[in-house]
Amino acid sequence: MEYMSTGSDEKEEIDLLIKHLNVSEVIDIMENLYASEEPGVYEPSLMTMYPDSNQNEERSESLLRSGQEVPWLSSVRYGTVEDLLAFANHVSNMTKHFYGRRPQECGILLNMVISPQNGRYQIDSDVLLVPWKLTYRNIGSGFVPRGAFGKVYLAQDMKTKKRMACKLIPIDQFKPSDVEIQACFRHENIAELYGAVLWGDTVHLFMEAGEGGSVLEKLESCGPMREFEIIWVTKHILKGLDFLHSKKVIHHDIKPSNIVFMSTKAVLVDFGLSVKMTEDVYLPKDLRGTEIYMSPEVILCRGHSTKADIYSLGATLIHMQTGTPPWVKRYPRSAYPSYLYIIHKQAPPLEDIAGDCSPGMRELIEAALERNPNHRPKAADLLKHEALNPPREDQPRCQSLDSALFERKRLLSRKELQLPENIADSSCTGSTEESEVLRRQRSLYIDLGALAGYFNIVRGPPTLEYG
């Protein structure tokens, strides 16, 4: 079978349709189809992790109607991956029976960092949930990161004192795909899933906490990332992708908000759109992902492979180095509600690569954004690219946030010593632009220093400064 082709007649019809549509018509169509601006829309996963779901659904419905308790839904307890997948399938299939009918919480836990008490795991008494505070922003900002159809909270088990991320998904939007990949595949660059608990009408997913926030949050608060920071993040994500792709898993939503900083690494999160391929080419029934990072072959819906993640990573690299996603500077969202047609006709967005990008990094990005997926490198190939393996003398001295903060303080002290007396004196009143910048930088150092000291968090990516 020709790659990316499901039949010559169908191909000719689609090409003919696209050829005769003008941009305004396409925009109107896409705006109606994708009225919601929430990225990463959930659709049922096509991977079958629990083949007897129909039989189990009938059995569960029968038990619920008879007033008997379903074993998976009677309490919060430790279990196997198979138990968790069975629980997820039952919750997803029996949504209509749960509204107002759950006297207490129930769930399956995979890790003993979560400590239930007598089959219960109650909010406030057993686990504390607080809105996630972005470490790069003012503590009072009240920022709560969002994933597809879910909020993320910081959770702490009251007995083990383990801090975790807790993603809340309304039960009517919960799908088994939300837990399948993380439960079945373990890797250091994939956020570990600790368990799932159903409280009332909301499923709570507990996983490794990325207390350093996401790449998107860092970009929004600190601006474009430096190249050695990008190298650090990219190597971690490519390791995760190499593992997933070796298992024939497509993540389908690689983007800055789904890359999270742990204490010493970067990890991938949000696997709700992921699928496990059963053949060399995945033939989708729907669009999966966030369109601004989508590859051309995903948009055409004629079939794609794990190479789609590589293209999305290339688009993410542009976002990291410029602080702006590809396409949006040249095609503002206000004028172009959808980028699907633009990506189909004009990809790859090589014009959006940063002007100060090194030759090696530019070569890597161009390779990742190769329009033909057959010519696009694998994750393992990109890991060997010279852009990600610079000479030792070119690597930064700072390998942690602590050392970066120390370096920042040293640089600030040096700048203050070099300032003329009249400017140094005016820094308290902010009478000059330079002194105002210095004052903000000092404030940033104090805020980050306090956070690092109190929470003992984030030791990556390596950077000379976070400002």
UniProtKB/Swiss-Prot annotation:
Superkingdom, taxonomy of origin: Eukaryota
Induction, as annotated: Up-regulated by Il12 in T-lymphocytes. Up-regulated during in vitro adipocyte differentiation. Up-regulated in epididymal adipose tissue of obese mice.
InterPro entries tied to this protein: Kinase-like_dom_sf, MAP_kinase_kinase_kinase, MAPKKK8, Prot_kinase_dom, Ser/Thr_kinase_AS
Known EC number: 2.7.11.25
Modified residues (Phosphothreonine): 80, 290
Tissue: Expressed in bone marrow-derived macrophages, peritoneal macrophages, splenocytes and 3T3-L1 fibroblasts and differentiated adipocytes (at protein level). Highly expressed in adult submandibular gland, thymus, spleen and newborn digestive tract.
Phenotype of the disrupted gene, per the record: Mutant mice develop normally and show histologically normal bone marrow, thymus, spleen and lymph nodes. Mice are resistant to the induction of endotoxin shock due to defect in the induction of Tnf in response to LPS. Mice display impaired host defense against T.gondii with reduced parasite clearance and decreased Ifng production. Mice also show increased susceptibility to M.tuberculosis and L.monocytogenes infection.
Active site: residue positions: 253 (proton acceptor)
Post-translational changes noted in the entry: Autophosphorylated.
Entry-linked Gene3D superfamilies: Phosphorylase Kinase, domain 1 (3.30.200.20), Transferase(Phosphotransferase) domain 1 (1.10.510.10)
Swiss-Prot/TrEMBL GO biological process terms: immune system process; positive regulation of inflammatory response
Subunit structure: Forms a ternary complex with NFKB1/p105 and TNIP2. Interacts with NFKB1; the interaction increases the stability of MAP3K8 but inhibits its MEK phosphorylation activity, whereas loss of interaction following LPS stimulation leads to its degradation. Interacts with CD40 and TRAF6; the interaction is required for ERK activation. Interacts with KSR2; the interaction inhibits ERK and NF-kappa-B activation.
Function: Required for lipopolysaccharide (LPS)-induced, TLR4-mediated activation of the MAPK/ERK pathway in macrophages, thus being critical for production of the pro-inflammatory cytokine TNF-alpha (TNF) during immune responses. Involved in the regulation of T-helper cell differentiation and IFNG expression in T-cells. Involved in mediating host resistance to bacterial infection through negative regulation of type I interferon (IFN) production. Transduces CD40 and TNFRSF1A signals that activate ERK in B-cells and macrophages, and thus may play a role in the regulation of immunoglobulin production.
Family: Belongs to the protein kinase superfamily. STE Ser/Thr protein kinase family. MAP kinase kinase kinase subfamily.
Protein's name in the database: Mitogen-activated protein kinase kinase kinase 8
Organism listed in the record: Mus musculus (Mouse)
